[in-house]
Amino acid sequence: MNLNEMITEKEAVEYIKEKRKIFANSKQISAKNLNSNTLSVNGYANNLFLIKDENNNKVVLKQVLSYVRKAALENVEIPLPKKRIYSEFYSLKFWRNTCPGYVPEVYLFDDNNNIIIFEYIEKMFLLRSALIRRKRFENIDDKIASFLAKTAFYSSKYFLKEKEFNRLSNFFNKSDTINVWDDLIFIRAVLKPENRSINPFIKDKILEYRQDQKIIRKTKEIRSIFKNKKISLMHGDFHSSNIFVDENKIKIFDTEFAGFGLPSFDMGRLIGNLFLNYSSLLGMDYNVHRKKYQKYILKFVSNMYNSFKDKFSKLIYRKADLSFMNLEEYFSEYLYQTLSFISLTIISRLYDEGLCLDLKKIENIEKRTIAQEFAIIISKEIFYNNKKIKDIEELINMVILPQKG
């Protein structure tokens, strides 16, 4: 772990001037470190800079590190594969073709120095920030569904010829993404969570969750599927802090953990984070606006999931060979996997070092405990019933019922 490899603001400016491909005619170039100004894990794991010139043209420079930057500064080493820079660049290239306008433009890719330079996204909210502020958007759920459906289809055998599919999957299989998430979602969250700090008021409940033999069995079951089944490209780190939104569009970023695996992983990760926001509202003082916003979140989840099914089905019917496709079986397995990943995502974001901002912003520990306890309850209920729930409305009702009780 070499902290000296992290470039400084001055070195970032010198790098831009040396390349001259970007801001070629600019006379004044400045850099501002963004590492403490982001709600995304992007700024925790990597070295980020906002670069701008005298005409207020802006780009983001990202230096990909071989360890989690924030942890390293605290003298804790959490290694990360440097090759993920290839996953980021080539996944964005894929999405620019299949989902134009949904991902940022890439202006420079320098694999020798582990640097990638992107479009700077302005005048948009991180979805997590928007949820915390209780903002509402009309079409965002549909746009996210479109991104997920197109990814699940255009990178799968339903669209690609076998040779193309194998080439794409073999490339992304080199990224080590599956092992990264195996460690974070399965091992460190449930199976072997060694030395994990957590809110002491929920420590016993988390321990009970982790020692539950049914939970352990179900975790091992979905883990085996996750590690061995390769269906399509997945973003990997698909949660509400990696999606920019406004009234009319979305921008999805931080794709360095893109890999080949289960498309349900992205859906499960995002819904899990949405349910964490729903849970966090229980840590707030009760009022009618809180209740209405919880309903909005559940409607968002329902609309997004149903829209995904509709869009994916249309792609299959219009462009796929249906002779080897059973759509009903596909969605049944997809839902089971999604439910499992929702549960595991929720638990993984309750530990102190991974605590999502939705919960972290509840400063009163007793009120935060109420929200976290609810999150544990729904995680367990969903996991217990991951093969019984038949549609998204059953899931929504399951989230509502514990609160009523």
Report the location of each language-model feature.
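Conserved structural core of kinase catalytic domains
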Residues: 105-143
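Short, flexible/disordered intra-domain loops and linkers
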Residues: 68-83, 282-296, 360-368
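ATP-dependent phospho-/nucleotidyl transfer catalytic cores
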Residues: 128-143, 147, 157-235
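Active-site acidic catalytic loop and adjacent metal/ATP-binding pocket
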Residues: 38-55, 59-60, 219-265
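Active-site activation/catalytic loop segments of kinase-like enzymes and analogous catalytic loops
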Residues: 264-319, 342-360
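A glycine-centered beta->alpha junction motif in the catalytic cores
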Residues: 64-71, 120-134, 153, 276, ...
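Conserved NTP-binding catalytic cores of kinases and kinase-like/nucleotidyltransferase enzymes
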Residues: 1-114, 393-405
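ATP/Mg2+ or Mg2+-diphosphate-binding catalytic cores
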Residues: 327-405
